[in-house]
């Protein structure tokens, strides 16, 4: 099978590079990159995949000014954040970035000490399939009682959304934000791991550490 072949390739060669996408061709769409990772992460360890983020300022004229999913409509922080469950790949020449891009270095420094811990867990997709309009994300299950969640609010008008996770039904869980725009909260997990998350801004994210209470 294709998945079996991919697993063999991974075990033999290490990280997997999925595909070239370039703003030159107008075929780099951040939500599609996120969707590829989300769909494959059920079958291939996310931490083995190299997922690209590009210079959103380059070739902006290749996209329609009315295209809601054009790279220029996203923050550079968000473009980096969609790669966090995988191996982030800066698919660009850093020398061509504008000065404002370097503010994302702060986010990178925040993530570096967390990456190994996040990747030690079993990483699975949660929420809805990324479509550019969804609430979606990933869960890293480090143990029965702790792990991490990355929650993404794509371009939609819903500031609070209940999504399915892999958390145990009926348990109380503490969610502590480590990166992004979320707030600390405690919730009781519903049927099918349902938990409500809140993000005030479109195309925003939060990386939470979670702890399941006894």
Q: Where are the language model's segments positioned?
A:
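C-terminal beta-strand-rich structural cap/linker in extracellular carbohydrate-active enzymes
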Residues: 185-214
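Aromatic/acidic polysaccharide-binding cleft in carbohydrate-active enzymes
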Residues: 10-112, 151-153
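Alpha-helical protein-protein interaction modules
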Residues: 102, 106-132, 152-155, 163, ...
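Short, small-residue-biased leader/transition segments that mark boundaries at the very start
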Residues: 2-9
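Carbohydrate-binding surface patches
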Residues: 129-171, 205-211
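Solvent-exposed beta-hairpin/edge-strand motifs
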Residues: 166-183
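Generic recognition of flexible, low-complexity loop/linker segments
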Residues: 68-70, 79, 134-139, 162, ...
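Short, flexible beta-strand-to-coil junctions
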Residues: 9, 153-156, 178-180, 211-214
């Amino acid at each position: 099978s294709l998945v079996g072949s991919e697993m063999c390739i991974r075990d033999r060669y290490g990280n997997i590079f999925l595909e070239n996408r370039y703003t030159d061709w107008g075929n780099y769409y951040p939500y599609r990159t996120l969707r590829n990772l989300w769909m494959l992460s059920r079958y291939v360890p996310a931490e083995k995949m190299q997922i690209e983020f590009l210079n959103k300022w380059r070739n902006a004229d290749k996209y329609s000014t009315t295209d809601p999913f054009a790279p220029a409509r996203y923050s550079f922080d968000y473009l980096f954040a969609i790669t966090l469950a995988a191996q982030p790949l800066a698919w660009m020449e850093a020398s061509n970035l504008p000065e404002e891009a370097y503010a994302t270095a702060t986010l990178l420094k925040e993530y570096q000490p967390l990456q190994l811990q996040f990747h030690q867990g079993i990483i699975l997709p949660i929420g809805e399939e990324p479509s550019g309009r969804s609430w979606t994300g990933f869960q890293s299950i480090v143990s029965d009682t702790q792990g991490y969640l990355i929650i993404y609010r794509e371009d939609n008008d819903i500031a609070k959304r209940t999504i399915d996770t892999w958390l145990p039904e009926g348990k109380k869980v503490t969610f502590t934000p480590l990166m992004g725009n979320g707030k600390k909260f405690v919730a009781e997990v519903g049927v099918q791991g349902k938990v409500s998350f809140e993000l005030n801004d479109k195309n925003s994210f939060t990386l939470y550490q979670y702890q399941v209470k006894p």
